[in-house]
């Protein structure tokens, strides 16, 4: 455990600080860090050592969850660059995206009211495709250092993930 708890998540796993992550390398590095900090290795250690090992394990878990999920990784990367996504406070979106949001919400509501699982499935496919395309665009924005636009893209992706989740739940409810 030569690294320090204050190290950024990328440094913890020895990865380059970038949006694109080699998932196999991340998984391998995570297993290495976890094995070094596993509580069983410190069962006979003193309280202070066990506490530090638990902090390391918790830090590694949080780092792994963050870097494994593209949207969380992008938000974290922007934070490292001094950019606060402000998802709670900054809801400014382009008029085109606002219109798209309304269309998706309306399609969701109508399909639920009509119990049209096939339309919900189609909406879910559309949302997942939109999400894939936007993640690719987000990667390009981050790689280009366009942090402001990347922050806007993150906020849009948060909305898309929310409606994707709502659509998935609606399908589950209707299929029960």
Swiss-Prot record:
GO MF annotation list: ATPase activator activity; protein-folding chaperone binding
Alphabetized Gene3D superfamilies for the sequence: DnaJ domain (1.10.287.110), HscB, C-terminal domain (1.20.1280.20)
Alphabetical keyword list: Chaperone
The keyword Chaperone belongs to this UniProt entry's keyword annotation: yes
Matching Pfam families: HSCB_C (PF07743)
Superkingdom to which the source organism belongs: Bacteria
GO cellular component, one term: iron-sulfur cluster transfer complex
Swiss-Prot/TrEMBL GO biological process terms: [2Fe-2S] cluster assembly; protein complex oligomerization; protein folding
Domain J: 8-80
PROSITE patterns: DNAJ_2 (PS50076)
Family the UniProt entry places it in: Belongs to the HscB family.
HAMAP family, per the entry: HscB
Assembly and binders: Interacts with HscA and stimulates its ATPase activity.
Biological role stated in the UniProt entry: Co-chaperone involved in the maturation of iron-sulfur cluster-containing proteins. Seems to help targeting proteins to be folded toward HscA.
Stated name of the protein: Co-chaperone protein HscB homolog
Organism: Cupriavidus taiwanensis (strain DSM 17343 / BCRC 17206 / CCUG 44338 / CIP 107171 / LMG 19424 / R1) (Ralstonia taiwanensis (strain LMG 19424))
